[in-house]
Amino acid sequence: AFDESKDSLKFLKKKYPFVNCLKRIDGILKFDLIFLSGVIHHIDKNIRKKILKKIYMSLKLTGRLIIFEHNPYNPLTNIVVKNCEFDKDAQLIKKKDLIKICENISFKVDDSAYVFFFPSSMKKFNVLEKYLEWFFLGAQYFCIFKKNESLNKIN
């Protein structure tokens, strides 16, 4: 696990002592999978590309990057983020903007969708989510990225 927040890593290590916590991501270690859930909106807009480049360099050629983020198009998500103490400095990012940044780094989108359309009190409607993944009002979205195969053949 890696987190810029040393406090988060201390908490993780205390609760799950078997987890290997990394002090930095520098591209030396290579991973099959890197998973970010609700992280990008905490990274300042001005350094997102730099951080995502480090992540790109830390993936194996066949590796995947999976990102889940809050959807700024969803009005309820905006209310939750606005009232969350952890999100005081949050800068939500649209799915298309995240994809654009990642494609500029040489990631290729493997899959993406909007998710979480219904609150838990309406879970019987969750079966409809697979038909709504294109609709921009899900509470969150995910993107699965891989390294651009045409560039991998060159490297």
Where are these regions (language model features)?
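Short alpha-helix
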Residues: 90-106, 111-112
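Acceptor-substrate binding/catalytic loop of class I
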Residues: 43, 81-97
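Class I SAM-dependent methyltransferase SAM/SAH-binding core
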Residues: 1-27
